[in-house]
Amino acid sequence: MKEERISNYVKLCEEWAQRFLKMDQADLHKRVPELKEENGFLTIIHFGRRYGVSLEDGSIRSLDGQREPDTTEMLNIYTLLGYAKEGAFIMDKWVPFADLRNARPFAPAYQIGETDVFSATFSGHEKELREAFQKLDGRELPQGDVGYEIRAFDCMPMRFFFWERDEEFEAQGNILFDYSATDFNLSLIHI
C-alpha cells in the first residue's frame, strides 16, 4: 500500500486551525476588528476575496463561490489572526519592505523573489497589470506608469508602482507597505 504524503504547509495549516480554536475570540476581535461573525464563521476579506474561518474546526474556506484557498492564502490569514497586535492602526507612512521593522535581513530575498519578479512579469504588459489591480478593487495612484493601492486585508494596504522599460532602463517595480504592517502580521514576506 502506498503511503500518502502530506505537505508540511498543509500540516502547518492544520496546526494553525487548532491554534485558532484556542484563541480568545473577544481578544481576536479587538486585534482584528474587520472580522465579522456569520453562520459559524469569522469572515475576512483577503486580496478582494471573502473567506471564512470555521468556529467549529478552525479551517478556512472560500465564501465567495470561487476556488478554495491554497496554503499560502490560509497561512496569510492565520498569521494575521495569530500575530496582530491590539491597538495596531494604519499610520499612512509608506515604506519599502526593507524599511519595515525587523525586515532588513530579509530584504535581498524579498527584492529577488517579489519585486524583481513583479517587474519582469509585467514588463510589456501595463494593460494586463491595470486590469489585475482593478479586479482586486485597487485604487489608482498617480505615481509610476501604473500605480495602485490594494488591500491584502482591510488593515493591511499595499501600494504597487510600476515603470515600463525604455531604451535606457529595464522595467522597475516597487511595493510599499504602511509602516504599521508588522504590527498586523510578522510574516509579510509571504503576502
What annotation goes with each model-predicted range?
Residues 28-55, 140-164:
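Amphipathic, interaction-prone secondary-structure segments
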Residues 2, 6, 21-22, 37, ...:
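N-terminal leader/targeting peptides and immediately adjacent processing regions
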Residues 189-191:
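Conserved small/polar residues in nucleotide/adenosyl-binding loops
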Residues 1-40, 73, 82-136:
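Short Lys/Arg-enriched alpha/beta "domain-start" segment
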Residues 65, 106, 117, 121, ...:
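Conserved aromatic-histidine-acidic binding/catalytic patches
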Residues 123-183:
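Conserved binding-pocket/active-site segment within a compact domain
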